[in-house]
C-alpha cells in the first residue's frame, strides 16, 4: 500500500468539515491525526528500507545520566535508532526484524484507519514494544485524537519505564490504581469514564482531541438558515422590549415615590372633629354670616328633612370679605357644629411646577371627601385657582380650575358633602365658578360694627385678667375699621405690655398703648433727632391738628404726636365717632384740607423754600381723594356725573385732560383754604407746636386745652435723644426771636 494515499490535504479536510458539521469534533480530530501519522509512517518506512539495505542510521546521543534522550517530536523520532537486538545470531535477528517491520507497517495502517478503537491501538503498541521501539509508543499515545484504554495506559507506562521516564510511569500507575478502586465501587461508571475520556481525562495538562485546544484549534464555518437569523433577531428585539418596558416602569415608580414628586399626592387633609372645638359661639361680630351657615349645619345633621320637601341646599358656599373678618373661623365652626370631617386646603397648594398636579390634587381631595361623607371641604384663598380665565392663557394654566368646575358639577346634591370657599377678591373669580349650581351661595363677612367689636373684645378678654376700669364698649367705639383679627391682637398686645410693666391686671392704659401701637405704629424711642427737625415736625403735626379741629366736616381728632412711629417722624390720627359707610363732598374737601395743613404750616413758619419732604405722604393721600372725587364719585362740575376710573384708557384725551385739570384745581383750592385757616389760627398753631415739643403726645382733650392756653397736669417728656443740628440748617434759628407763649407753664 502506498503511504501517500492516506495523506489528507487541507482542502479535503475543510470540505469534509463543512459536509459533516454535526460530527465535526470526532471527524475533524480523526482526520487531523491520520494526516499526522501518515507523515510519520512515510518516514518510518524510509527508515526500515535503509535498515534493510544495510545503511544504519546514526547512533542516539546519550545524556550525562547515560539514558537515551527521547523527544516526542517527529524530527527526534526520525533521527532515533532502535537499540540492537539482544540475540547473538545475526541472521535470525535480521529475519525477525524484517518480519517485524512488515507487521509494524500493517498494524500501523490498521491503527490509523481506526483511531477510535482502543484495541487496534493496543495491538500496535504491543508490536512496537516487542520491536523495542518504546519511544514511538510514548509519542503516539501522547498524540491528541488517538483512543486510549487501561490496557493502552499499561503499555504506555511500560514504554515510559524503558526510556527512563520513571516519574511519569509512577504517575500513570497511580492513576490506574485510582481508576481500579473507583471501578470496584461502581464498575459501570469507571468503565464508562475510562472509555470516554481515557488517559487524557486524568491529566489536566492534556486536552481532549475531540474539542480542540488552544494550540490546535478547530476551524469551523457555520452556515445559518433564514429561520435561525430571524429567530435571533426576534430574540434580541424581545429582550430589548422587555428591558425598555421594565426601565420605563421602574423610572415611573421611582419618580412617583421619591421625595421630589411624592408631594404631588394629596395627603389626608381631614381634621379630626373631636380635636376641633370651634363652635358658633366662638364666632362674634358676624351674626348674619353665621345665620347663613346654620342652614348648612342643619342639612348635614338631617339631610332627609330637605329631601322630603324637595329642597336643595347649595353645593358650594363662597365666603367673601376683607382679611381677618373670620371666614376660616366660620368654616371651622360649621364643621364643629355639624360634627363631620373637615378637609381644608389653600388655593396655592394645588399648583406646582409640574403640569397636571393641580388637577390631580383636586380629584384626590374630592375622592377623599366622598369616601368619608358627610364632610366639608374648605378651600382658602380660592382666587389663587379660581381666577378669571383668559383665552390667551396656556391650556395647562386652566386645568386646575376646569377640574374644580367638573367636580362641583359632579356632586350629588344629597351626597352630604359641602364645599366652602373663601376669598378677599370675589370680583377676581371666574364667572363659571360663581354661577348657580357651583358656588351659588355668596356670604359676605364684612368688618364688625361697634357692637360686633364689643362682642369680639369681650370674647377675647375672657382669657386675661382685667382691671375694674376696663370697658370693652369704650374700646370698641375707639377702634372703628378694625377687623376681628386686629382686635384679638389688640387684647394680646395689651396683656403682654401689662406683663412687661409688672402689672397685676390689664387696665385701660394698657389697651390705649396697644391701640396706639396698632393704629399709629410702634414707637421709635432710640432714634436721634436734631432740635430743628423736631421743631419742624411739631409745626407740621400742629398744622394737621388745627385743620382737623377747626374744619367743618373733618373726622374728629384722636391724637397728635411727634414721637417717631413706624416710618413717620410724627403723626396726627383721626377717629370717627361712628362707623361710616359713605362720605359726602364736604367731608372729602375736609380730608383735603387736613392733608394740606402740614405743608401750609411749614410754609407759614419756614417759608416755601424750607418745606420738608414729609409732605409727600400727605400730598399722595390728598391726590388720591381728589382723583376719586372727580373720576368715581361724580363730584366735579366740569367732568360731570361720569365714572372714569374704569377703562381710563378708553376715554378721549380731552375728557382725561379735563379730569386731570379738575383734580389739580381741587388740590389748589384746598391749599388756599388751609392757608387762610392757619393764618387765622396762627396763635393756636404756635401754642400747639410748643405743646408737642414739650409733651410729645397729646390727645384730643389735651389739644383743646393747649389751644386755649390752659395748663396741663402732665409731665414734660422727651423720649428721643435731641442734638443740636448743623449750622447749615436754615430752620435752626427760625422762630427763636418770637416770644414764648406765656400760658405754656411747666407742670
From Swiss-Prot:
Swiss-Prot/TrEMBL keywords: ATP-binding, Hydrolase, Membrane, Metal-binding, Metalloprotease, Mitochondrion, Mitochondrion inner membrane, Nucleotide-binding, Protease, Zinc
Enzyme Commission code: 3.4.24.-
Biased composition (Polar residues): 66-80
Effect caused by changing residue 354 to A/C/I/L/V: Partially complements a YME1 deletion mutant
A GO MF label: ATP-dependent peptidase activity
The keyword Repressor is annotated on this UniProt entry: no
GO CC terms, sorted: i-AAA complex; mitochondrial inner membrane; mitochondrion
Cofactor(s) needed for function: Zn(2+)
Active site as annotated: 541
Alphabetical list of InterPro entries matching this protein: AAA+_ATPase (IPR003593), AAA_lid_3 (IPR041569), ATPase_AAA_core (IPR003959), ATPase_AAA_CS (IPR003960), FtsH (IPR005936), P-loop_NTPase (IPR027417), Peptidase_M41 (IPR000642), Peptidase_M41-like (IPR037219)
Amino acids binding ATP: 321-328
Keyword tRNA processing: no
Biased composition range(s): Basic and acidic residues: 51-64, 728-740
Impact upon substituting residue 354 to F/W: Complements a YME1 deletion mutant
Enzyme class, first EC level, given as a word: hydrolase
Record text on cofactor binding: Binds 1 zinc ion per subunit.
GO BP field: membrane protein proteolysis; mitochondrial protein quality control; mitochondrion organization; protein catabolic process; protein folding; protein import into mitochondrial intermembrane space; protein import into mitochondrial matrix; protein maturation
Phenotype when the gene is knocked out: An increased rate of escape of mtDNA to the nucleus, no growth on nonfermentable carbon sources at 37 degrees Celsius, a cold-sensitive defect in growth on fermentable carbon sources, lethality in rho- (cytoplasmic petite) cells. Decreases processing of ATG32.
HAMAP family: FtsH
Recorded family membership: In the N-terminal section; belongs to the AAA ATPase family.
Note: Present with 20100 molecules/cell in log phase SD medium.
Record's function text: Catalytic subunit of the mitochondrial inner membrane i-AAA protease supercomplex required for mitochondrial inner membrane protein turnover. The protease is probably ATP-dependent. Important to maintain the integrity of the mitochondrial compartment. Required both for the degradation of unassembled subunit 2 of cytochrome c oxidase (COX2) and for efficient assembly of mitochondrial respiratory chain.
Xref: NCBIfam families: FtsH_fam
Subunit structure and binding partners: Component of the mitochondrial inner membrane i-AAA protease supercomplex composed of MGR1, MGR3 and YME1. Interacts directly with MGR1.
Name assigned to this protein: Mitochondrial inner membrane i-AAA protease supercomplex subunit YME1
Gene name per UniProt: YME1
Amino acid at each position: 500500500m502506498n503511504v501517500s494515499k492516506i495523506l489528507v490535504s487541507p482542502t479535503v479536510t475543510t470540505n469534509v468539515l463543512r459536509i459533516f458539521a454535526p460530527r465535526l469534533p470526532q471527524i475533524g480530530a480523526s482526520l487531523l491525526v491520520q494526516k499526522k501519522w501518515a507523515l510519520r509512517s512515510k518516514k518510518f518506512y524510509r527508515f526500515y528500507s535503509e535498515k534493510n539495505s544495510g545503511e544504519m542510521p546514526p547512533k542516539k546521543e546519550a545524556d550525562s545520566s547515560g539514558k537515551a534522550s527521547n523527544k516526542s517530536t517527529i524530527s527526534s523520532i526520525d533521527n532515533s535508532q532502535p537499540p540492537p537486538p539482544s540475540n547473538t545470531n545475526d541472521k535470525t535477528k535480521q529475519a525477525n526484524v524484517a518480519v517485524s517491520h512488515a507487521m509494524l507497517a500493517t498494524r500501523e495502517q490498521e491503527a490509523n484507519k481506526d483511531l477510535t478503537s482502543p484495541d487496534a491501538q493496543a495491538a500496535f503498541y504491543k508490536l512496537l514494544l516487542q520491536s523495542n521501539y518504546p519511544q514511538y509508543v510514548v509519542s503516539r499515545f501522547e498524540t491528541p485524537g488517538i483512543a486510549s484504554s487501561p490496557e493502552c495506559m499499561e503499555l504506555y507506562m511500560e514504554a515510559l519505564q524503558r526510556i527512563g521516564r520513571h516519574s511519569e510511569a509512577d504517575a500513570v500507575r497511580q492513576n490506574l490504581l485510582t481508576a481500579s478502586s473507583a471501578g470496584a465501587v461502581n464498575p459501570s461508571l469507571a468503565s464508562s469514564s475510562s472509555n470516554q475520556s481515557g488517559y487524557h481525562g486524568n491529566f489536566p495538562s492534556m486536552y481532549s482531541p475531540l474539542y480542540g485546544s488552544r494550540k490546535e484549534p478547530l476551524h469551523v464555518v457555520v452556515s445559518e438558515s433564514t429561520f435561525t437569523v430571524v429567530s435571533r433577531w426576534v430574540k434580541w428585539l424581545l429582550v430589548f422590549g422587555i428591558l425598555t418596558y421594565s426601565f420605563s416602569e421602574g423610572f415611573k415608580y421611582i419618580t412617583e415615590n421619591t421625595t421630589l414628586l411624592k408631594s404631588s399626592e394629596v395627603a389626608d387633609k381631614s381634621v379630626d372633629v373631636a380635636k376641633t372645638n370651634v363652635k358658633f359661639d366662638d364666632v362674634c361680630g358676624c351674626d348674619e354670616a353665621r345665620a347663613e351657615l346654620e342652614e348648612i349645619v342643619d342639612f348635614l345633621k338631617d339631610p332627609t328633612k330637605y329631601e322630603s320637601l324637595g329642597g336643595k341646599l347649595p353645593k358650594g358656599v363662597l365666603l367673601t370679605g376683607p382679611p381677618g373678618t373670620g371666614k376660616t373661623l366660620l368654616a371651622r365652626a360649621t364643621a364643629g357644629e355639624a360634627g363631620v370631617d373637615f378637609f381644608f386646603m389653600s388655593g396655592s397648594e394645588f399648583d406646582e411646577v409640574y403640569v397636571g398636579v393641580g388637577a390631580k390634587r383636586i380629584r384626590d381631595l374630592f375622592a377623599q371627601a366622598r369616601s368619608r361623607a358627610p364632610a366639608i371641604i374648605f378651600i382658602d384663598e380660592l382666587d389663587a385657582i379660581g381666577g378669571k380665565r383668559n383665552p390667551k392663557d396656556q391650556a395647562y394654566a386652566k386645568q386646575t380650575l376646569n377640574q374644580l368646575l367638573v367636580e362641583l358639577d359632579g356632586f350629588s346634591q344629597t351626597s352630604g358633602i359641602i364645599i366652602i370657599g373663601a376669598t378677599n377678591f370675589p370680583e377676581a373669580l371666574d364667572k363659571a365658578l360663581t354661577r348657580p349650581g357651583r358656588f351659588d351661595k355668596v356670604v359676605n363677612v364684612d368688618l364688625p360694627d361697634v357692637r360686633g367689636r364689643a362682642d369680639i373684645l369681650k370674647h377675647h378678654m375672657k382669657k386675661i385678667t382685667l382691671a375694674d376700669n376696663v370697658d370693652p364698649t369704650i374700646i370698641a367705639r375707639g377702634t372703628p375699621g378694625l377687623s376681628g383679627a386686629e382686635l384679638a391682637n389688640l387684647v394680646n398686645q395689651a396683656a403682654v405690655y401689662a406683663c412687661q410693666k409688672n402689672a397685676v391686671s390689664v387696665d385701660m392704659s394698657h389697651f390705649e398703648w396697644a391701640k396706639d401701637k396698632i393704629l399709629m405704629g410702634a414707637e421709635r424711642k432710640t432714634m436721634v433727632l436734631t432740635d430743628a427737625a423736631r421743631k419742624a415736625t411739631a409745626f407740621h403735626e400742629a398744622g394737621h391738628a388745627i385743620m382737623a379741629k377747626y374744619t367743618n366736616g373733618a373726622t374728629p381728632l384722636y391724637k397728635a404726636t411727634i414721637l417717631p412711629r413706624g416710618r413717620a417722624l410724627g403723626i396726627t390720627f383721626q377717629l370717627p365717632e361712628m362707623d361710616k359707610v359713605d362720605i359726602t363732598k364736604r367731608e372729602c374737601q375736609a380730608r383735603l384740607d387736613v392733608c394740606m395743613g402740614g405743608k401750609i404750616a411749614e410754609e407759614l413758619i419756614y417759608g416755601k423754600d424750607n418745606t420738608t419732604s414729609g409732605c409727600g405722604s400727605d400730598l399722595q393721600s390728598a391726590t388720591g381723594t381728589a382723583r376719586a372725587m372727580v373720576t368715581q364719585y361724580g363730584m366735579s362740575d366740569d367732568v360731570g356725573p361720569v365714572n372714569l376710573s374704569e377703562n381710563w384708557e378708553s376715554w378721549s384725551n380731552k375728557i382725561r385732560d379735563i379730569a386731570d385739570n379738575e383734580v389739580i384745581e381741587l388740590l389748589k383750592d384746598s391749599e388756599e383754604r388751609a392757608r387762610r385757616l392757619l393764618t387765622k389760627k396762627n396763635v393756636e398753631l404756635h401754642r400747639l407746636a410748643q405743646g408737642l415739643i414739650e409733651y410729645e403726645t397729646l390727645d384730643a382733650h389735651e389739644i383743646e386745652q393747649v389751644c386755649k392756653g390752659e395748663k396741663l397736669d402732665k409731665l414734660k417728656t422727651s423720649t428721643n435723644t435731641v442734638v443740636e443740628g448743623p449750622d447749615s440748617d436754615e430752620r435752626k434759628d427760625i422762630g427763636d426771636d418770637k416770644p414764648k407763649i406765656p400760658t405754656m407753664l411747666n407742670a
